[in-house]
From Swiss-Prot:
Function: One of two assembly initiator proteins, it binds directly to the 5'-end of the 23S rRNA, where it nucleates assembly of the 50S subunit. One of the proteins that surrounds the polypeptide exit tunnel on the outside of the subunit.
Name of the protein this chain belongs to: Large ribosomal subunit protein uL24
GO MF, any single term: structural constituent of ribosome
rRNA-binding as UniProt keyword: yes
Oligomeric form and interacting partners: Part of the 50S ribosomal subunit.
Record's signal peptide: none
Length: 102
């Protein structure tokens, strides 16, 4: 089970976008990376194809999972733990002890 999933609200802990928040768009567990909307935006040169024009586009690049933290209910970053509730493994916020999903 992953600690950070698609749709989670996260905050950046390090890097050029430190302190910025966004929603996880994609998680790549094998690479330990995630794509966060509005964070780590880079410019990419797009070659012209039959369907697309040539030009420079802005695109979100993946960030390492160690540089993001889930935002708790009070708006502060928290670590994630696991707990078994009713025979089901759920994610729990270490800061408040609340179940994140379930």
């Amino acid at each position: 089970m992953q600690k950070i999933r698609k749709g989670d609200k996260v905050v950046m802990l390090a890097g050029k976008d430190k302190g910025r928040t966004g929603e996880v768009v994609q998680v790549m567990p094998k690479e330990d990376r995630a794509v966060v909307r509005g964070v780590n935006v880079v410019k990419r040169h797009q070659r012209q194809t039959q369907t697309q024009e040539a030009g420079i586009i802005n695109k979100e690049a993946p960030v390492h999972l160690s540089n993001v933290a889930i935002i708790d209910k009070d708006g502060k970053p928290t670590r994630v733990g696991f707990k078994v509730v009713d025979g089901k493994k759920v994610r729990v916020a270490k800061r408040s002890g609340e179940v994140i999903d379930g």
